[in-house]
């Protein structure tokens, strides 16, 4: 499985080789770079013609046995109910549902799974797994089942209620939501923009924050689950396709005050683990990723990346030397004045992240 926000890579981790994520495109292992890696082009499922033309019997005068009555064609309703071809091949979505039905854990991203032919939130989730694997059902099924295993073991929804260390994580990450109006239409998901913010300049001690690997990964997963709550796939009524998917989030990684010359083993280990966990279990959730306050040397590194990753992938990564220019990036959006809604620190006129944003619980 290829590995893909979703987000990650922590401060102190030096740029490394480009890695691939199932769902977020080819993401470089650079500070802040996490999933959300991969492949978005989906293969069309093979359509099996239920009726093959039969050769015409030769004409002669010998008596012939009565021909078997022709089988009636399924009605559209029957086809939808069975979600199969006459060859017995289930549709890609139905195959994923059949696999998920046999699992003990029935939830992904806060959504109780159900038949995707009748439950749009499940259709969205399953289609994301297909999109992350270029429409290859077996690969999507493998990733889906492993995600169910991981969620059963980790119980990430419970991390939303966990108390994290204020000394380690306060001010490190936020989730903000900006809408076209007070109550955007539920059938127009494009009228809502969800951001996750990773402020690595707020880290007081790399060893303290990243030293306990499990604790840091749990905090990062809690931030991701908060973002998913804001996207609200469970309330969606508009399905997605291989080419249309508005249920994604923008990720911002701010490195203001971080020295890229400082590299600690614990920070690199935390980055590596986050990339794996988020890439494996949160495919196709990245809309755009902005790397802010990046030193000039990192800008040079991104120039070199053009030699190794596709243009489609690069279009999602935006290294910027100054965070104050971020607001200018949001022109083509259905949320009017989105740039102005961002905090002043990022070129907008909105409230600061501590006032407006949501974050995992710290104490």
Curated annotation (Swiss-Prot):
Heme binds at residues 200, 220, 253, 255, 289. PROSITE patterns: CRAL_TRIO. It catalyses: a 1,2-diacyl-sn-glycero-3-phospho-(1D-myo-inositol)(in) = a 1,2-diacyl-sn-glycero-3-phospho-(1D-myo-inositol)(out). SUPFAM superfamilies: CRAL/TRIO domain, CRAL/TRIO N-terminal domain. One of its GO terms (molecular function) is metal ion binding. Its cofactor is heme b. Residues 1-84 are annotated as: Disordered. CDD domains: SEC14. InterPro entries: CRAL-TRIO_dom (IPR001251), CRAL-TRIO_dom_sf (IPR036865), CRAL/TRIO_N_dom_sf (IPR036273), Sfh5 (IPR042938). One of its GO terms (cellular component) is plasma membrane. It is a peripheral membrane protein. Residues 64-76 have a biased composition (Low complexity). It comes from the Eukaryota. The keyword Nucleotidyltransferase does not apply. Residues 36-46 have a biased composition (Basic and acidic residues). One of its GO terms (biological process) is Golgi to plasma membrane protein transport. It is found in: Cytoplasm; Endoplasmic reticulum membrane; Microsome membrane. Belongs to the SFH5 family. This is Phosphatidylinositol transfer protein sfh-5. It comes from Neurospora crassa (strain ATCC 24698 / 74-OR23-1A / CBS 708.71 / DSM 1257 / FGSC 987). The lineage of its organism: Eukaryota, Fungi, Dikarya, Ascomycota, Pezizomycotina.
């Amino acid at each position: 499985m290829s590995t893909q926000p979703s987000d990650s890579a922590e401060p102190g981790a030096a740029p490394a080789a480009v890695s691939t994520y199932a769902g977020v495109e080819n993401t470089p292992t650079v500070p802040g770079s996490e999933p959300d890696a991969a492949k978005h082009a989906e293969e069309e499922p093979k359509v099996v013609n239920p009726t093959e033309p039969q050769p015409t019997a030769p004409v002669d005068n010998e008596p012939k046995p009565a021909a078997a009555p022709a089988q009636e064609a399924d009605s559209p309703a029957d086809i939808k109910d069975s979600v199969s071809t006459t060859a017995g091949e289930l549709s890609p979505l139905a195959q994923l549902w059949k696999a998920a039905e046999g699992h003990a854990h029935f939830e992904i991203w806060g959504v109780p799974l159900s038949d995707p032919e009748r439950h749009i939130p499940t259709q969205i989730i399953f289609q994301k797994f297909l999109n992350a694997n270029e429409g290859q059902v077996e690969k999507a099924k493998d990733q889906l089942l492993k995600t169910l295993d991981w969620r059963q073991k980790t119980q990430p929804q419970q991390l939303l209620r966990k108390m994290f260390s204020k000394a380690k994580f306060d001010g490190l990450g936020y989730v903000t939501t900006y809408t076209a109006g007070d109550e955007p239409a539920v059938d127009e998901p494009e009228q809502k923009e969800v951001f996750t913010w990773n402020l690595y300049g707020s880290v007081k001690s790399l060893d303290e924050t990243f030293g306990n690997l499990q604790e840091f990964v749990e905090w990062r997963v809690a931030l991701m689950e908060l973002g998913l709550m804001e996207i609200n796939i469970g309330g969606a009524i508009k399905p997605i396709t291989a080419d249309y998917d508005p249920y994604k989030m923008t990720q911002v990684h701010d490195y203001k005050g971080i020295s890229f010359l400082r590299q600690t083993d614990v920070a690199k280990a935390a980055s590596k683990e986050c990339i794996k966990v988020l890439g494996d279990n949160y495919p196709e959730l990245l809309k755009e990723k902005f790397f802010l306050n990046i030193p000039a040397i990192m800008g040079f590194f991104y120039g070199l990346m053009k030699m190794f990753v596709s243009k489609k992938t690069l279009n999602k990564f935006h290294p910027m030397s100054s965070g104050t220019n971020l607001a200018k990036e949001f022109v083509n959006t259905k949320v009017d004045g989105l740039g102005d809604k961002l905090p002043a620190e990022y070129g907008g006129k909105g409230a600061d992240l501590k006032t407006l944003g949501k974050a995992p619980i710290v104490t």
